[in-house]
Amino acid sequence: MKPSWLQCRKVTGAGTLGAPLPGSPSVRGAAVTRRALVAGFGGRGCRALTTGSGGEYKTHFAASVADPERFWGKAAEQISWYKPWTKTLESRYPPSTSWFVEGMLNICYNAIDRHIENGQGDKIAIIYDSPVTDTKATISYKEVLEQVSKLAGVLVKQGVKKGDTVVIYMPMIPQAIYTMLACARIGAIHSLIFGGFASKELSTRIDHAKPKVVVTASFGIEPGRKVEYIPLLEEALRIGQHRPDRVLIYSRPNMEKVPLMSGRDLDWEEEMAKAQSHDCVPVLSEHPLYILYTSGTTGLPKGVVRPTGGYAVMLNWTMSSIYGLKPGEVWWAASDLGWVVGHSYICYGPLLHGNTTVLYEGKPVGTPDAGAYFRVLAEHGVAALFTAPTAIRAIRQQDPGAALGKQYSLTRFKTLFVAGERCDVETLEWSKKVFRVPVLDHWWQTETGSPITASCIGLGNSKTPPPGQAGKCVPGYNVMILDDNMQKLKARSLGNIVVKLPLPPGAFSGLWKNQEAFKHLYFEKFPGYYDTMDAGYMDEEGYLYVMSRVDDVINVAGHRISAGAIEESVLSHGTVADCAVVGKEDPLKGHVPLALCVLKKDVNASEEQVLEEIVKHVRQSIGPVAAFRNAVFVKQLPKTRSGKIPRSTLSALVNGKPYKVTPTIEDPSIFGHIEEVLKQAV
């Protein structure tokens, strides 16, 4: 079905232009009449959802819990719909929740076409900055539409239709975003897998998703080396069961062409040259937009399924309400498209809201140096940056005084957001000092697709919250701290972080082909709640402190000690640049904490001296109950591509147990180095 844009303009929110809606406002979560709302760059959207005081945050959070249908129905008016929804919230079959039932939309239209129809086609949609290829490009909304609509035509020509899956195996290039949007345009379900991901893991995901087409690129570029994607893909297809009908290959410019397999492979440029543009295909609100596989799973792959309608509503709302951005401002999420941050806040979120998104093919250090982030912020006039604490630590480790950043003027830079792992106070304070903007930690998960807790600065939350917190509950997320018996804990008591159902729009609707695991993993331990599997506590003001995964709570002689709390204490000692704490088995206490530390470059003291000081420091800040006495010093910690430390793997290594190095680890050789250090320490 080809959409009528006149119809799309007239059918928005949950009703036709000026027409009364069937059903009561309380059921529909809306006023009795509505007018078309096609949000443009100049529009303010829902006034009450964009600016305000701390009191406004409280009002919004209370409303989202008391009457979620009305609250999110109002937010959904900012998205264009082909067909009105008949019910805002359907939760008859818990734990599953459906939002905007029977409503029809297209997220690609909302992210691209509607801005052009609003006269904003020449505005910049994507800034591509690739220090690894020495390339910079600005791409307008019109140019994105031209590429995306043609690519949609290419996919349709190859037999891809609504509901089919497409695997995307590409580096951080604009063509990856075009492919995501092209799939969304025709109702195909994309599954984006890291470019350069190991063949075995790639094969598992291809077999599970069963894509009609795989879209890939010839090469990825890492600092100092090229990654050949085609041999990795060929090996994945050789060892796997599923065979895609076609493999579409984008050959990167100024690099050698890769040979095509006759009858299967297609050349991107050749297909695009003869492609016909394709219109958007309306899909139901609950239609899966994408499958995103999470790492470290056993058995069936854990493919998070994202419903289209709720995701579009939530992401658009967060850009103003959480991140405080106005349409047209430049936003940079320094992540990878393969992570949920890349899906939500490199691709869909900023484009839905009419922002310019920075696509950065580089690293915080080494491309070429620790001044890279400062350069990108200054050159492109970035208003807000979202990165992981590990990126900040890497910059600090190489350039403790941020001397390389001082040459850049960050006149438009307003806010730095961090997430992906717990941000220690030392890193937070250093970031504030060198970037000279508020630095706000927030917390969310692949499953939720957007923040669970944050400082919602668009709703008037403080830009100077207490150190160590990860924000307050985002409207829609009714977070509680429970013990293992489902009893609510008092302020500052460490417990299980859970979310009272229903989950708000945008949260996952299931696991691909594995709904039993969806129910068992997330909803059985605490009936009526979503189990985040994280541990933490809330203070008296409602700020959440996420300490560690539940598995990372160390039981020391019956005392539950958060590994994250010890890490923060160690990092606050001036000699340590990075740290991971794991529980080491102990015949007397059950477990004792062991710290793996990376020292700062300018430390002159001996390791024995440093250890003595750190032990004393931890005893002063946490107390003798932590039983902290041991640390080893390593040159580097293993990290995933999203900057997370694989603590369960390190725990197995430290305790002499078999361990598996997941393919998301950037440098697996570090485990061998740590093993050697541990042997010498015994």
Swiss-Prot record:
GO terms for molecular function: acetate-CoA ligase activity; ATP binding; medium-chain fatty acid-CoA ligase activity; propionate-CoA ligase activity. InterPro entries: ACAS_N, AMP-bd_C, AMP-bd_C_sf, AMP-binding_CS, AMP-dep_synth/lig_dom, ANL_N_sf. It comes from the Eukaryota. The modification N6-succinyllysine is found at K513. ATP binds at G420, E421, R422, D441, H442, W443, W444, Q445, T446, D534, R549, R560. Its main location: mitochondrion. PROSITE patterns: AMP_BINDING (PS00455). It catalyses: acetate + ATP + CoA = acetyl-CoA + AMP + diphosphate; propanoate + ATP + CoA = propanoyl-CoA + AMP + diphosphate; butanoate + ATP + CoA = butanoyl-CoA + AMP + diphosphate. The gene is Acss3. This is Acyl-CoA synthetase short-chain family member 3, mitochondrial. GO terms for cellular component: mitochondrial matrix; mitochondrion. The lineage of its organism: Eukaryota, Metazoa, Chordata, Craniata, Vertebrata. Residues 1-29 form a transit peptide. Keywords: Acetylation, ATP-binding, Ligase, Lipid metabolism, Mitochondrion, Nucleotide-binding, Transit peptide. CDD domains: PrpE.
